[in-house]
A protein has these predicted regions:
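Short glycine/threonine-rich loop-to-helix capping motif typified by GTGT followed
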Residues: 113-119, 244-249
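Short, contiguous, pocket-lining structural segments
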Residues: 115-120, 137, 155, 165-168, ...
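ATP-binding N-lobe of GHMP and related small-molecule kinases
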Residues: 1-118, 125-138, 143, 147, ...
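Short arginine-rich
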Residues: 152
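C-terminal nucleotide
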Residues: 1-16, 41-75, 172-279
Length: 279
């Protein structure tokens, strides 16, 4: 996150990539994301009154009133990412926000898998924290942004996107344990190679996609495993041989989901070691 001096405050909030560890964050395993050099720019300006005006250079703006209950807008309205964060801040820091306007501009492709939604959520949280001296920690803001996605958008996401956007640093990968939230910054020294992002122009929306269904499948798998081995709290920590032993208790799709999660967790930890060893 970077704060500059335009408006009362201008924030640049980056997108993110994830090298490996897909669908692992909500299964309590390890992921290996990094912030990227594309971002959302948000300009904030304080004002009198209680009505806030949010504008965007790419879509219609909207208004909300801080003195009225904050409720989700209609399905898929982009404003839910913003007002969900506002709701979370008001619950943690009641009566500390006053009216503001903000203008949003982005060079992050929307729905392209580089977390434009998390960039918006975390940028709003960071900016308001700075603007109103809310004394929210990094982790406070990360969790506010994640909860906004759960409660206002309808995506039961893990914590990786918001964590990577908030904690990412230039030329660093983040090895994140999504259960404990312990993390390690790993130098992304891959010369003479570069990571290149390709925009396929295929858009997706996690809230209306199979994302939530995949999470439900993983939860079904864990519930079956816990009926035999209650010591396991997360799917990513279950040994592969246990999943294979219980194969007949899973339907075909759930078995594939569970197997993938455990194998992907192993691949992620192996990949992080290879990168750290410069191999």
């Amino acid at each position: 996150m970077v704060a500059t001096n335009k408006f009362d405050l201008t924030v640049q909030s980056p997108g993110r990539i994830n090298l490996i560890g897909e669908h692992i964050d909500y299964n309590g395993g390890h992921v290996l994301p990094a912030a990227i050099n594309l971002n959302i720019t948000i300009g904030f300006k304080k004002k009198t009154g209680s009505v806030c005006h949010i504008t965007s250079k790419s879509t219609d703006g909207f208004l909300f009133n801080l003195e009225e209950p904050i409720k989700p807008k209609s399905n898929n309205h982009w404003g839910n990412y913003v007002i969900g964060v506002i709701d979370g801040i008001l619950k943690l820091r009641p009566n500390l926000l006053s009216a503001f306007d903000c203008e949003i501009e982005s060079n992050l492709p929307i729905g392209s898998g580089i977390s434009s939604s998390a960039a918006l959520e975390c940028g709003i949280a960071f900016g308001l924290n700075e603007l109103f001296n809310l004394d929210l920690t990094d982790l406070d803001r990360i969790k506010i942004a994640q909860k906004a996605e759960h409660d206002f958008v309808g995506t039961k996401c893990g914590i990786m996107d918001q964590f990577a956007v908030t904690m990412g640093q230039k030329k660093k990968l983040i090895l994140l344990n999504c259960e404990t939230l312990d993390y390690q910054l790993i130098p992304a020294d891959i010369n003479p190679y570069k990571i290149v992002l390709l925009n396929t122009n295929v858009a997706h929306n996690l809230a209306s996609s199979e994302y939530n269904l995949r999470r439900e499948d993983c939860e079904k798998a864990l519930k079956i495993i816990q009926s035999h081995f209650p010591e396991y709290k997360h799917l990513a920590e279950v040994p592969l041989d246990i999943i294979k032993t219980l194969e007949k208790e899973f339907d075909e799709v759930v078995f594939k989901r569970a197997t993938y999660v455990v194998e992907e967790e192993n691949r992620t930890q192996m990949a992080s070691k290879v990168i750290q060893n410069g191999e």
